[in-house]
Amino acid sequence: VTEGVDGVQVDLLVQEQISCLHDYTLTVSDMRAIEKADVLVMNGAGLEDFMGDALAASDAAVIDCSEGIELLPALGHEGHDHDTEYDPHIWMCEESALVMMNNILHGLGALDEKNLDCYRENAAAAAALVPEDDARMENLACPYLITFHDGFQYFALDNGLNLLKSIEEEEGAEASAAEIQEVVDLVREYEIPAIFTERNGSEATARAISRETGCAVYQLDMIMSGDGTGIQPYLDAMQKNIDTIAEALG
């Protein structure tokens, strides 16, 4: 949206590729970046709860990218202390990502009216790159999805997949024996050929289930960060997720 606009510098707060932001802690450099920022573009929907104190101390304008998006209830997980009411992983649906981009367009346009036309042109060019729905998703041999990350609800809904089970694993909060047995039972009942981990997360439990049931283990990408070069790397990552699903469940 900001490409080619003089005087606008975009920096990513969370630059590392991580599996989960639930327990992210702001670094000293993060705090400095927030203090210097004129505008903070946030995912919203509770994803950046870790920024509460920093936001209260900041004079920056805030653009909430989740405005206008119908949010799904957060998935509950045994033994996990996530207080978010709604699932914040809205960018995992390309239609929602376009709404997010539109929110950025309107937010920046209101703050910087002289460059509104440029923001509009950039947003339109980016939107034109979003591909049509992949027909392979309509003809999968197995439409059932089991993931080891709680962020694939929007992705599943957008692609006509039935998310049977989502296990959120992180340090100090591994899957329980009951959750593991539930996944084993589901794999056998629905004859599921593959289960999915997040590429920056642990595969240990999924591999154990694979040995027990014979199902394959594939990786999906939550795209928690990027290189700041525009929409194409995001679209490439989403396409790779689609290709992975088609290979694993097709």
Place the predicted regions along the sequence by residue.
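Extracytoplasmic metal-acquisition and chelation regions
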Residues: 1-250
